[in-house]
From Swiss-Prot:
Source species taxonomy: Eukaryota, Metazoa, Chordata, Craniata, Vertebrata
Keywords: Disulfide bond, Hemostasis impairing toxin, Platelet aggregation inhibiting toxin, Secreted, Toxin
Organism the protein comes from: Daboia palaestinae (Palestine viper)
Full protein name: Snaclec VP12 subunit B
One term under GO cellular component: extracellular region
Segments passing through the bilayer: none
Annotated localization: Secreted
């Protein structure tokens, strides 16, 4: 698709890939940065991107939680995406806490960063 690597899917200038291996947040982010140039855990910026992401992840993972690149790196500091993208779209399920993850029903959940979870990597096309 467009300029994505084999096995990656294209959507609006970015490439995405769902990984069916469970890692904690830090290891998943590190994996994404090593897997592809400028790769990171997914950051989401619109309902359309969320719908695309879900159409990609749900057939593979069914109902589950996937890591996304949102975490509060230091206590009392603003939330940010791991790729430094602006937090211009939000879908918190309850209150934001330490780390962000995402389920297949568009809700964002706080989760223990050390829990192994599936994840989606994203990189510029």
């Amino acid at each position: 698709d467009q300029d994505c690597l084999p096995g990656w899917s294209y959507f609006e200038k970015y490439c995405y890939k769902v990984f069916q291996v469970k890692k904690n947040w830090e290891d998943a982010e590190k994996f994404c940065t090593e897997e592809v140039k400028d790769g990171h855990l997914i950051s989401l910026h619109s309902n359309e991107e969320v719908e695309f992401m879900t159409s990609l992840a749900f057939p593979i993972l069914k109902y589950d939680i996937v890591w996304m690149g949102l975490r509060n790196f230091w206590r009392d500091c603003p939330w940010k995406w791991s790729d430094d993208a602006k937090l211009d779209y939000k879908a918190w399920s309850d209150e934001p806490n330490c780390y962000g993850a995402m389920t297949t029903d568009y809700q964002w959940l706080r989760w223990n960063c050390n829990d192994p979870r599936y994840f989606v990597c994203k990189s510029p096309a």
